């Protein structure tokens, strides 16, 4: 197959060589059409116009109405492609193409804007919903904690008011002079026993044993004898310390047990004071009356 020369700028087309079959002629014509179409596209893009292309322009103007009808039936992307390529040919067909392209371009822009705005709105709505849910999740524990703290504060305030009323009611009874009720029979027995023990220790035992060993033995005996003595009713005294402990959240049972322990320690300390004071007093009397007494 001989090489076929390309089309010149003047628009002259070389004749097809003779002696070719029908299929070869068809292929040659297709190739020439493709070359011409590519040249025309390049010239349109670059802005060149061939002077001898009047007949071709007429053919193009005739085919433009058909192209406009096809454009109306085609989709939006095909219209946009043709608008980008664009024809530099003047005439009514070009005006129609421009109008169609503008209308379709505006429609395309509106649709694209709607498609773009819809995901943005949905994303904004989703972000707002997430922020609201997060805010609700973070607000729920804070509200619960504040509600719990408020309830605790109110309960403690009520307890403080009750303790205040109890303190006010107990003060007149203490001022009336009913202190004799505090000393029961067992308490008096303890004090008398400590004084007698101090006398006996000073008279007979101080040479051989420590003065505190008999006292500890007596306290152990008191712990066993406490069961056999009648128990008087103990009035629970409400003090500022107990009120403060209750308001701080310590249970009342723990406070009562601690108060009982402190009262027992106070009794033991009182017994020790009586015992030691009696012992020293006896010792001074013996030294004053008889210097020879050991």
Curated annotation (Swiss-Prot):
The modification Phosphoserine is found at residue 53. Residues 1-75 are annotated as: Disordered. Residues 59-70 have a biased composition (Basic and acidic residues). Changing residue 207 to A: Impaired tail-anchored protein insertion and a shift from GET1-CAMLG heterotetramerization to formation of heterodimers but does not affect recruitment of GET3 to the endoplasmic reticulum. InterPro entries: CAMLG. Keywords: Disulfide bond, Endoplasmic reticulum, ER-Golgi transport, Membrane, Phosphoprotein, Transmembrane, Transmembrane helix, Transport. One of its GO terms (cellular component) is cytoplasm. The keyword Iron does not apply. It is found in: Endoplasmic reticulum membrane. Changing residue 202 to A: Impaired tail-anchored protein insertion and a shift from GET1-CAMLG heterotetramerization to formation of heterodimers but does not affect recruitment of GET3 to the endoplasmic reticulum. It comes from the Eukaryota. It is a multi-pass membrane protein. The chain crosses the membrane at residues 188-205, 211-229, 268-286. One of its GO terms (biological process) is negative regulation of proteasomal ubiquitin-dependent protein catabolic process. Component of the Golgi to ER traffic (GET) complex, which is composed of GET1/WRB, CAMLG/GET2 and GET3/TRC40. Within the complex, GET1 and CAMLG form a heterotetramer which is stabilized by phosphatidylinositol binding and which binds to the GET3 homodimer. Interacts (via C-terminus) with GET1. Interacts (via N-terminus) with GET3. GET3 shows a higher affinity for CAMLG than for GET1. Interacts (via N-terminus) with TNFRSF13B/TACI (via C-terminus). Required for the post-translational delivery of tail-anchored (TA) proteins to the endoplasmic reticulum. Together with GET1/WRB, acts as a membrane receptor for soluble GET3/TRC40, which recognizes and selectively binds the transmembrane domain of TA proteins in the cytosol. Required for the stability of GET1. Stimulates calcium signaling in T cells through its involvement in elevation of intracellular calcium. Essential for the survival of peripheral follicular B cells. This is Guided entry of tail-anchored proteins factor CAMLG.
